[in-house]
A protein has these predicted regions:
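Bacterial N-terminal signal peptides
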Residues: 9-18
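Low-complexity, Pro/Ser/Thr- and charge-rich linker/hinge segments at domain boundaries
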Residues: 28-30, 130-151, 226-252
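Aromatic sugar-binding surface patches on proteins
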Residues: 91-97, 182-194
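Short, ordered, surface-exposed loop/turn motifs in non-cytosolic proteins
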Residues: 153-181
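Extended, charged catalytic domains and RNA/DNA-binding interfaces, predominantly
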Residues: 158-165, 169, 187-397
Length: 397
């Protein structure tokens, strides 16, 4: 079953806005069985098939929509030409895509959204479709907002996370791109200095500043609907403070990956290091797969060494389990990740690195066809291996 949306026309409302979908709501789509019982018993459709009409003299160049709870691969196409895939993210967010030249035609056009790839059940919400007659970057760079976040105790700028919500409480897009002091995603900007000039489309926003669980939040409501693009950006100072006394303790993330080295996720190494500071982590462990990566040189180069101490580790990724190990001496040889038993793997880890911490990761997940804590390999009642193996780790994740 395919959901046929209401017909719309492209109407030039201004240089920037081109059209809005008449159905101002979110549609519930599902392929397969209901994912969780928190979703309605019946979805509205398993896919989206939307016809819209455009004028040859006013062709849209980009469009946006809102999505919620996307976990699997959903592909957007216009006139059977793939535009892109929905970000796999459960948050409610506004997503933008540019429309490549030659995709649209004068008259009727068709936008489709279908789940592709592995057909795993996935309930999602999609809607508030809008078209624009400028590029995404142009649309999201019409206005600027100056933000400075300081530590209330020191009165100095502080690393933090900025969350930008639109008037519906949805993560809003910005025209910002990641720099050597910022890491940018939909509705979120991490800053290592506390200082950011936001680029946004005209509208009403709520901007939150925080720095992980130990710090307070501050926020400001901003209306840039009618502000002139030629005037100086309005400036909003925000201040946060440490609220949890953690004397004698350290905030540690023992499982840190980067796209740069692990080839999954989407954070480059510089982006990841900025987010570590922005979340108040004080002891991050580098655990890229079967690699010993020293983050310290780039941490120092980015001026982040006053906020945390990076530790070399490794997610030793084997057929019979994934093990985060640390600390690892700089230059230490890699453990043998091709070994087939926990005893051999533990011995290789000790021989090559001497790591004192070994964490067995996600033992109930399937990787390479093997689940370390499946009933065939692990007795839940006794806590012992069905294979007679000794537990090799000092902790589990």
């Amino acid at each position: 079953m395919t959901m046929q949306l209401l017909h719309i026309s492209i109407i030039a409302l201004s240089f920037i806005f081109a059209s809005t979908l008449q159905a101002e709501r979110l549609l519930h789509l599902r392929l397969g069985e209901r994912e969780w019982d928190t979703f309605p018993t019946q979805s509205e459709s398993d896919s989206l098939d939307h016809t819209f009409n455009v004028d040859e003299d006013n062709m849209p160049r980009s469009f946006s929509f809102e999505q919620i709870d996307v976990k699997q691969q959903w592909t957007l196409a216009i006139n059977s030409k793939t535009i892109g895939k929905l970000p796999r993210d459960e948050n409610r967010m506004v997503v933008f895509f540019d429309i490549p030249e030659g995709v649209l035609k004068s008259g009727n056009n068709k936008l489709t959204l279908v789940q592709t790839g592995r057909k795993t059940p996935d309930d999602i919400y999609f809607g508030y479709l809008r078209f624009y007659n400028v590029s995404t970057q142009e649309h999201l760079s019409q206005r600027e907002i100056s933000i400075q976040v300081t530590d209330q105790a020191t009165k100095q700028g502080t690393p933090c996370r900025l969350t930008i919500l639109n008037s519906r409480g949805t993560l809003a897009g910005t025209g910002n791109e990641s720099t050597n002091t910022t890491a940018v995603r939909e509705g979120v900007i991490y800053t290592s200095t506390g200082k950011v000039t936001l680029k946004v489309a005209p509208g009403k926003y709520t901007i939150y500043a925080g720095r992980g669980m130990e710090w307070s939040l501050d926020s400001v409501k901003v209306d840039v609907t009618t502000a002139s693009a030629t005037t100086a950006p309005p400036h909003y100072p925000l201040a946060i403070r440490r609220e949890v006394d953690t004397a004698g303790m350290v905030a540690c993330d023992t499982h840190v990956h980067t796209l740069t080295y692990s080839r999954h996720g989407d954070a480059s190494l510089p982006e990841r290091l900025i987010t570590v500071a922005g979340e108040g982590i004080e002891l991050p462990i580098a655990t890229d797969h079967n690699l010993h990566i020293n983050y310290a040189p780039l941490v120092n180069q980015l001026g982040l060494n006053r906020y945390y101490t990076p530790v070399i580790g490794n997610e030793v990724t084997t057929r019979v389990g994934h093990f985060n190990i640390f600390p690892v001496p700089d230059g230490a040889p890699l453990p043998n990740h091709t070994l087939e038993t926990w005893k051999e793997i533990a011995a290789s880890i000790q021989d090559q690195t001497g790591a004192s911490a070994i964490i067995l990761n996600h033992p109930r997940d399937v990787h390479g066809g093997i689940t370390p804590f499946s009933p065939a390999r692990h007795n839940d009642v006794t806590g012992r291996s069905q294979l007679g193996w000794e537990f090799p780790a000092t902790a589990m994740e």
